[in-house]
């Protein structure tokens, strides 16, 4: 496909953006337009994060359980979502878009607030969960960057893209998932809820799609620092 004919839906869930984000988005929009991309921006907000993400796909609960993104009325090639606290460059955004040529689902990496981990889980290690009460996030100092594209079980949706046809194959509402139940060694039943991004990644896997991260595509993650 000629990239100069691609229509990219850029989802910006949220209602407050930093000056850095606005600068980065403005520069990216100029560069995307210059390169011939058609950009459709979807800015939506809800206090319930799952609804924010659903709204950026043009979803409406009144259309029922069999609905598809944008009611099937928007001809697009890539749906790409950027969280309001992500710091990115135009070339990173373009690389993420172009990666969808090779991978139906692809994401960049960004650090969590502890600075020691990425918002990514390589695999759902149940034994680790039983011991720690959480799954094991990828460590920054252990990332193998010689493997540019890596399959993961989960990556946060802060800088994330899907080729058209992927989400259409999921079951609405996409961002919810059944409770996860795990039996501990002492027989106790552990019950865990999925966040909306974990739910989305699990739904992708259930539909036969791998989540791939570009390990060279590391973006910033703005957080408040109290001094």
Regions flagged by a language model, labelled:
Residues 1-47:
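N-proximal low-complexity "stem/linker" segments adjacent to membrane-targeting elements
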Residues 89-182:
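Conserved catalytic core of nucleotide-sugar-dependent glycosyltransferases
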Residues 24-27, 55, 95, 199:
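Alpha-helical elements of Rossmann-like donor-binding domains used by nucleotide-donor carbohydrate transfer enzymes
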Residues 76, 102-103, 209:
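Short, high-confidence coil segments that cap the C-terminus of an alpha-helix
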Residues 3-5, 20, 169-227:
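C-terminal catalytic/acceptor-binding lobe
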Residues 21, 52, 92-93:
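Residues at alpha-helix caps and immediate loop-helix transition turns in enzyme cores, especially N-
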Residues 49-72, 202:
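Short, conserved alpha-helix that lines the donor NDP-sugar binding/gating region
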Residues 66-87:
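Short beta-strand-to-loop acidic/aromatic patch adjacent to the donor-nucleotide binding site
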């Amino acid at each position: 496909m000629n990239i100069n004919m691609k229509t990219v839906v850029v989802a910006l869930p949220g209602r407050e953006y930093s000056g850095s984000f606005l600068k980065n988005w403005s520069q990216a929009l100029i560069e995307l337009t210059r390169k011939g991309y058609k950009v459709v921006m979807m800015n939506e907000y809800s206090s319930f994060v799952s609804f924010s993400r659903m709204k950026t796909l043009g979803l409406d609960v009144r259309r029922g359980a069999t609905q598809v993104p944008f009611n099937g009325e928007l001809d697009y090639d890539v749906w790409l979502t950027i969280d309001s606290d992500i710091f990115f460059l135009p070339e990173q955004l373009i690389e993420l878009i172009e990666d969808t040529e090779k991978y139906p689902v692809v994401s960049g990496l960004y650090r969590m607030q502890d600075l020691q981990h990425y918002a990514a889980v390589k695999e759902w290690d149940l034994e680790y969960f039983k011991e720690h009460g959480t799954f094991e996030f990828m460590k920054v100092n252990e990332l193998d960057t010689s493997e540019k594209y890596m399959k993961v079980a989960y990556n946060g949706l802060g800088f994330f893209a899907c080729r058209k046809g992927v989400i259409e194959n999921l079951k609405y509402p996409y961002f919810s998932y059944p409770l996860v139940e795990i039996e501990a060694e002492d027989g106790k039943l552990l019950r865990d809820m999925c966040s909306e991004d974990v739910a989305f990644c699990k739904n992708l896997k259930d539909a036969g799609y791998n989540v791939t991260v570009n390990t060279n595509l590391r973006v910033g993650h703005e957080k408040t620092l109290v001094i």
